[in-house]
Amino acid sequence: MSSSISIHLWICVLVFLPPCYPGLDYTYFEDDGLIIKKTDWYLHLKTKKLDDHIRKVVKNVERREGGYEANFNDHLSMDIGSPEHGLLIDSQLSEELYSLYVHAQIISEASYSIRRDECPSWKAAKDLRKVKLDKTSMGEMCLSLYYNKSACIGMNLKYRSPDGSCNNLKRSFSGKATTAYKRLLYPNYSNEFNEVPEEYYSDYRPSPRILSVAFVKDEHSPDDFKTMAMAYWTIFVGHDLSHTAISIMMISNRPVRCCHESRVELNPGKRYHELCLAVKVPVEDLFFSNNVRCMYYGRSVPAVRSDCTFGPKEQMNQATHYLDGSMIYGSSAKRTWLLRTNLDGQLLTSMGCDNKSHGDPLQPQYMPLEDTESNACQYGSGTCYRAGDIRANGLPQLTVMHTLWMREHNRLAKLLSHVNPHWDDERIFQEARKIVTASIQHITYAEWLPALLGENYTRWNGLELPTKGYSNAYNETTDPSVSNSFATAILPFANSMLSDTISLYTEHRVINASLSLREHYNRPTGLLSNYMDQLVRGLSTQNTQKIDMLFTQTLTNYLYSAHPIHEFGMDIVSLDIQRTRDHGIPSYSEFRKYCGLKAIRSVQDLSKIMVEGSTDRLLKQYRDWTDIELLVGALFEKHEDDSMVGPTMRCIIREQFIRTRMADRYFYDLPNIFNEYQLTEIRKVTLARIFCDNSNNVTMMQKKVFLIPAMADLQLCDSQLIPKININHWSEMVDTFKK
């Protein structure tokens, strides 16, 4: 191991901040030599001992990664356009987060090192959560991230920060991008800290690919009442709330290769790299039959615990934890800056086929082409769009949704500048962003959640918003963090709602053509300029697929495959199951207990709550019902009344969106966010109006775009039945006159 590598990593760990940072809140931490309590085994963990473990881990990382690069250097490069490249695009770690990632990974490994050497007990993980980092070499970094008293000084707190910081004025880090997902239940790791349980590789918890093949069918299963807009709004909102990244090499910043280019094991018969958790493909797999035995999966990027302690591994959310439009504007100041014109509050646009910005209102506007990052587009620079979230390009109609909201921002910015000609670029941008964010929140709670969970359920379970006046729902003690179970095991239900066939519709909702999702995955640029309006009508007309275990092969066999170059792709169900294991998500039965649902005590109990025919299939793969994983159980669960999901999934979704609202100081219906006239206008917003105002030339739309329309439901976009907001209520002169 070269000394230069050692110095590089150790400097990265230790020189995060100067030794004494004046803005840090040291009063939060106890100042005793033994750290925390005076009882139990961790009494003896003095700072020197903790730092010894940290140093040992750093040396182990240097040795491990140096040896890995020496042995497999020829196989570490990732082919541009490959399925692995496609996955890395969706899950890539932002450059500015690299240092945080390295710290979190070392703390995670040091936690296990302490447990192994100091207390080989099965309760050690919970004990170590009481041991603070503050006096160790990692302390300054964690304190600066979570307990920096000066973090909000100098910020314009009238508007949201790009990264979600300073929403909570007492805990500036709360809900911030780069912080950890929240645990609803204690994580399930085999060593209590970071390892996937060994039983996942035994006979009763087989490879995720075996489960995918056993459970998933590619059959048409349309929902008779809901449109494809349900699927894409789910994904759109999911990307606003969560973004999990894949770990990379901590010294070279290169991807960790788990599989050979030929997609066999890179290191057969031996332990994978610490950051690898490749999906094993069985020999008898009928699709991957041509020597494909390995599906790439890199472990998720860890996060530093918000209480600055050692303990079990947590995963980082790169997105802000708030419903704040971060998929449009980005989750960092840097990303937001890359999307702005810095003129008249506008977001950057392009003509769709080149990257020239234009101001001609008669020409359709598209998001700017991504030509700055060579690896950001699967098919090369300039073949995808730049958005607040890098995942905007995978699904054509998701790209449409991003385009509509980019246009909505610019439309509002233009109107605001007209009624307030004295406003500068920054004021126009922030006010337009504020209206866009409020509109997304209103559509999510007033239209999408009732359609997903059922109107009666949302009404009687704390999810219905007031239709008049202000709410008093904000609670500064509520944690806004997106739950790990929601992001990892529940949100993937949206993938089952997709179809390989993308139907294109005329103005009168007649299908005149169709496209294949497989042929256009990650290839959005030419598609939008040719089919924008047909795709918008498709969102509001084509039936979404039911939420179940039926998935298109585009996602289970051909995911990220560059058609027709690559014969095989990846499997989204296998990857999602593997991610739940990587994150230590407890079982389906444990979450039924959490939700207060009836416990499963027999095969008969299981049969009553699962869809017909699924119980035998489940117990053929799992030893018993206690081993069924949350993602699998939730997708097989019977739906309730007018809900699109089962009771366990509904419970976890409800828990998330109650906190998402209560913990947001900027939620749109709180006092001092909008005046009473403006709030009335926000409550008029519908997704139908967004489709009407921001398509190229759609002239008819149903008022409720999440519901399948009859011809009688279609209204002219100019109709008062699809109301418009009156931007004059944002004129400062008008407000002054009324007062």
Specify the residue positions occupied by each region the protein language model found:
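Cleavable N-terminal signal peptides of Sec/SRP-targeted secreted and luminal proteins
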Residues: 4-22
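A generic structural signal for short
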Residues: 2, 401, 576-577
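Alpha-helical bundle segments that constitute or directly flank the non-heme di-iron/ferroxidase center
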Residues: 395-407
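Terminal regions of secretory-pathway proteins
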Residues: 18-396, 414, 419-739
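A positional/structural detector of protein chain ends, strongest at the extreme C-terminus
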Residues: 1-4, 738-739
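Secondary-structure-rich domain cores
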Residues: 409-411
